[in-house]
């Protein structure tokens, strides 16, 4: 059975790169009818925070990446790590090192001057010490070879590898040790992660082999860059995943876009999550870096809003309505309003903002627009009279009244439509005025027209 995992370190929020890694690992487990594990790698006690843990869990939950096991915490497994470290020490596959930071710094500088790779020289390897950090006794000969599912065959000479530290002087284990022990104990057989981890893989493979454990498969995902070709950072949009929720993005739109950062299926761009699971193949992930484009993500969001069910939109709108303190009343029917708005809104923030005009009264108008469109009140006054006499308050009838007023006053549509739009919305941000007027309702529409006339 396939078993994948997402194993973030809680030293910050869940960002775009981490979300894509989690999604690909989740997809692969679902596609293979396997299991997806969430593990929190929090052994770095100085940098790990509960706030970061909460942010990661919130992001995973919002994205809908349900996990079969977890969240599992490395801090609950210290006894197991100590057991493995002691085993390696007993088998002479690890040793204590008391080299000072100063000595190591001098060593690095000397090797760098000589044009050599800066790595530990094994000074304490045969001293039989009993205190200090613990280093893994990396093989001195041979080549580490592995077939990465994405990158292909990768090999590195053991002479290039360091005797990595697997336990700090305070006895806490380090990343490369804990990740190997966890993946083995949790029966993870496919490790999907960013290619910034690829240099760790040969070291971890040597640890697997020293412990006599079966190797998992590795799949290293290409880096995500900004449009300028530089590694993604905050200025490109590498913000917390929850910032995208706050900005009005649908989780499935974000996931759809993230899937396209490295994976493709012909020329098709919009997929349901189920379709991505069906079509996705790790071997089809591009080796080259992917570029993050905020405008493209916005397009994905707009298209997803258009095709989403009203039920799904309402579910995701709830947070935004609460955030903007919008209280939904019985009329007009919220489902009808959302169905109208979904073809014109790029984000849920836009949609929530436009919902206001249907449910919240206002007592003023955009001053700049009012000076422009309320200068001549004749069209509004005429429109008020005709609409007040209208017996059947439907969009088609309202449209005919607007056309009639334009004809009677011998003016273009804009001379009537723009003032009417501003009167209905307060800020001029409304779509088809006939549909908006119908949804707002006759009484409220007439009250707003009267307020515009008196403004």
UniProtKB/Swiss-Prot annotation:
Residues spanning the signal sequence: none
Record field: catalytic activity: tRNA(Glu) + L-glutamate + ATP = L-glutamyl-tRNA(Glu) + AMP + diphosphate
E.C. code: 6.1.1.17
Entry keywords, A to Z: Aminoacyl-tRNA synthetase, ATP-binding, Cytoplasm, Ligase, Nucleotide-binding, Protein biosynthesis
Entries under InterPro entries matching the protein: aa-tRNA-synth_I_cd-bd (IPR045462), aa-tRNA-synth_I_codon-bd_sub2 (IPR020751), aa-tRNA-synth_I_CS (IPR001412), aa_tRNA-synth_I_cd-bd_sf (IPR008925), Glu-tRNA-ligase_bac/mito (IPR004527), Glu/Gln-tRNA-synth (IPR000924), Glu/Gln-tRNA-synth_Ib_cat-dom (IPR020058), GluQ/Sye (IPR049940)
Motif ('KMSKS' region): 231-235
Sequence motif 'HIGH' region, location on chain: 8-18
CDD domains according to UniProt: GluRS_core (cd00808)
Positions that bind ATP: 234
Entry keyword Transferase: no
Alphabetized Pfam families for the sequence: Anticodon_2 (PF19269), tRNA-synt_1c (PF00749)
UniProt record, GO biological process: glutamyl-tRNA aminoacylation
Record's keyword annotation contains Membrane: no
MF terms in GO: ATP binding; glutamate-tRNA ligase activity; tRNA binding; zinc ion binding
Localization annotation: Cytoplasm
GO cellular component, one term: cytosol
Family: Belongs to the class-I aminoacyl-tRNA synthetase family. Glutamate--tRNA ligase type 1 subfamily.
Function as written in the Swiss-Prot or TrEMBL entry: Catalyzes the attachment of glutamate to tRNA(Glu) in a two-step reaction: glutamate is first activated by ATP to form Glu-AMP and then transferred to the acceptor end of tRNA(Glu).
Quaternary structure (record): Monomer.
The protein's name in its UniProt record: Glutamate--tRNA ligase
Organism: Vesicomyosocius okutanii subsp. Calyptogena okutanii (strain HA)
Chain's gene name: gltX
């Amino acid at each position: 059975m396939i078993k994948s995992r997402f194993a973030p370190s809680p030293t910050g929020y869940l960002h775009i790169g981490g979300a894509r890694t989690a999604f690909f690992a989740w997809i692969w487990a679902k596609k293979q009818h396997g299991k997806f594990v969430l593990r929190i790698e929090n052994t770095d006690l100085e940098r790990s925070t509960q706030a970061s843990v909460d942010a990661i869990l919130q992001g995973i939950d919002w994205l809908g990446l349900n996990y079969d096991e977890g969240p599992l915490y490395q801090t609950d497994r210290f006894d197991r790590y100590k057991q493995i470290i002691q085993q390696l020490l007993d088998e002479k596959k690890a040793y204590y090192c008391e080299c000072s930071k100063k000595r190591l710094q001098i060593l690095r500088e000397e090797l760098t001057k000589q044009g050599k790779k800066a790595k530990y020289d094994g000074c304490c390897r045969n001293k039989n010490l009993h205190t200090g950090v613990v280093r893994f006794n990396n093989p001195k000969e041979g080549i580490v070879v592995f077939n990465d599912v994405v990158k292909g065959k990768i090999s590195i000479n053991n002479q290039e590898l360091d005797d990595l530290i697997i336990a700090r002087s305070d006895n806490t284990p380090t990343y490369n040790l804990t990740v190997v022990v966890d993946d083995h104990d949790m029966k993870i057989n496919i490790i999907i992660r960013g290619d910034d981890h690829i240099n760790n893989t040969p070291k971890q493979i040597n640890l697997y082999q020293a412990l006599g454990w079966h190797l998992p498969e590795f799949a290293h995902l290409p880096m995500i860059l900004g449009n300028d070709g530089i590694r993604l950072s905050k200025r490109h949009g590498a913000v917390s995943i929850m910032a995208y929720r706050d900005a009005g993005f649908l989780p499935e739109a974000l996931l759809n876009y993230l899937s396209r950062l490295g994976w493709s299926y012909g020329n098709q761009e919009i997929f349901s999550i189920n379709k991505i699971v069906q079509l996705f193949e790790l071997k089809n992930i591009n080796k080259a870096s992917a570029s993050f484009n905020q405008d493209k993500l916005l397009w994905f969001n707009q298209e997803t809003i258009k095709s989403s069910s009203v039920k799904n939109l309402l579910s995701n709108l709830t947070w935004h309505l609460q955030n903007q303190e919008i209280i939904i009343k019985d009329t007009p029917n919220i489902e009808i309003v959302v169905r109208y708005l979904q073809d014109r809104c790029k984000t849920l923030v836009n949609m929530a903002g436009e919902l206001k005009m249907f449910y919240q009264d206002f007592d003023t108008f955009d001053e700049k627009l009012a000076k422009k469109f309320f200068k001549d009140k004749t069209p509004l006054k005429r429109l008020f009279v005709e609409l007040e006499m209208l017996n059947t308050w439907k969009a088609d009838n309202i449209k005919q009244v607007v056309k009639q007023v334009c004809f009677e006053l011998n003016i273009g549509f804009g001379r009537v439509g723009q003032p009417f739009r501003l009167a209905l919305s307060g800020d001029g941000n409304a779509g088809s005025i006939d549909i908006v007027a119908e949804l707002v309702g006759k009484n409220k529409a007439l009250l707003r027209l009267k307020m515009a006339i008196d403004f």
